[in-house]
């Protein structure tokens, strides 16, 4: 396992909201923004795992997303801590595998943003998607 974390350098995003007829900018909590991300293959289980590290850590629970995708979210916060992709689903060569995993990862994150596991963490899921998009080459390097 490559446990090298990739530092996340994205600035805290502003989210524009309408409150009682006024437009306001809401800053995402630094506790919801990953500090680092990593991707690696768990060879014993033939799983590609993408993990997110935050300022504070907590116990996680597993949430199946589909037959071949599992999410690990914070037990109390609902923050996204990991995405597990079952590599046995992909019966492709090395180059094709990387493309298929990248596509599956984008689909999982897009679905998570549209239908959040925890509606209160929708901005955390958007930030996780942005982090993965910005660091995709490094995250998928083990494949």
Question: Where are the regions a protein language model picked out?
Answer:
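Intrinsically disordered terminal and processing segments
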Residues: 1-70, 75-76, 91-143
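Residue-level recognition of conserved beta-strand positions in structured domain cores
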Residues: 52, 84-85
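Hydrophobic "anchor" residues
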Residues: 79-80
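Short, solvent-exposed aromatic-acidic interface loops
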Residues: 85-91
């Amino acid at each position: 396992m490559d446990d090298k974390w990739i530092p996340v350098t994205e600035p805290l995003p502003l989210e524009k909201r309408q409150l009682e007829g006024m437009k306001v900018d809401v800053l995402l909590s630094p506790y919801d923004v990953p500090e680092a991300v990593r991707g690696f293959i768990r060879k014993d289980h033939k799983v590609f795992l993408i993990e997110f590290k935050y300022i504070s850590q907590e116990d996680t629970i597993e949430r199946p997303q589909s037959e071949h995708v599992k999410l690990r979210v914070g037990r109390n916060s609902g923050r996204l801590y990991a995405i597990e992709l079952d590599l046995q689903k992909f019966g492709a060569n090395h180059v094709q595998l990387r493309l298929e995993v990248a596509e599956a990862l984008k689909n999982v994150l897009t679905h998570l943003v549209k239908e959040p596991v925890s509606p209160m963490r929708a901005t955390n899921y958007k930030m996780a998607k942005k982090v993965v998009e910005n660091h995709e080459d490094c995250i998928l390097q083990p494949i």
